[in-house]
Amino acid sequence: MVSQNVFHNPQKHRTIFVEGTTDYCYLSTFKLYFNEREFKNNPIPFTFLPISGLKNDSNEMQKTIKKLYELDNNPIVLIDDDRKCDFDQNAKSEQFKRANEEMPDPITILQLSSCDNRFKQIEDCFSANDREEYAKNKCIELAMAFKTRLLYSEKDDVVGEETKNNFKKLFEWIVWITNLIKC
């Protein structure tokens, strides 16, 4: 007799791969925060996993894409928007999208700026004040300290409403867009 089984239903719960550990930390922290406070009855239906960056050349990017297929049948990656302007095709995010398009079976790429053109990187979801305090550089120690403070502080004012609303907007967009993707 089996006392407990764990099943993963990708139609109800998706894995979203993110570029790095700080992105993972911020997104996972807000997911836990919202699930405990606002979405207890309808938790956010995805888990974030970091992929250690987009890599530096097309071959390495394509190796990463192949590895993602080993982890998930329908990989979804949330990437920054590294373009300096709309015409910047040399940005790493654009190179990654091109490398993906060259694959026989491309993965799904979600770009932050498609949610809101102000969101070029995860840190842009923070208000100016919160960014200065918690996300001024991509430092994992700062991100971990933020996680501890947000999740374990009894205070509800660790971050401002603008920051909460921005992350909520991002999560709602991810839920909406992933519901359009067939598993």
Model-derived segments and spans:
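Acidic, divalent-metal-binding catalytic cores of TOPRIM
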Residues: 1-183
